[in-house]
């Protein structure tokens, strides 16, 4: 999903994307993020903000330049509501990072 444009993310906030169809399975996810100080973490959770954690993306200090970050996904198939839950990894709790877009990637095993 392009152009989310979520800025000034605080610890514990989340974004809900309803009805994402992962088909027979997604193996990884890309996310475009930027941070100026400590960054943080994005938890990819299914169906509720504290549901199954399908993956986790660490967002480092990118010197405020957007970077594409990738992580593996587990047990991520079918249709789900997806929660991107934002967490602090330092004493900083406000304005952790910016989140521009995300894209799930299907497994390439057996595909041509």
What are these regions (language model features)?
Residues 1-112:
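Extracytoplasmic
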């Amino acid at each position: 999903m392009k152009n989310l444009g979520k800025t000034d993310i605080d610890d514990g906030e989340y974004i809900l994307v309803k009805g994402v169809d992962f088909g027979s399975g997604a193996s990884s996810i890309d996310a475009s993020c930027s941070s100026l100080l400590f960054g943080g973490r994005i938890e990819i959770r299914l169906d509720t903000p504290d549901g199954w954690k399908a993956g986790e993306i660490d967002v480092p200090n990118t010197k405020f330049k957007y970077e594409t970050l990738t992580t593996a996904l587990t047990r991520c198939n079918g249709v789900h509501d997806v929660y991107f839950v934002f967490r602090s990894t330092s004493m900083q709790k406000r304005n952790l990072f910016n989140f521009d877009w995300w894209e799930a990637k299907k497994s390439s095993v057996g595909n041509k």
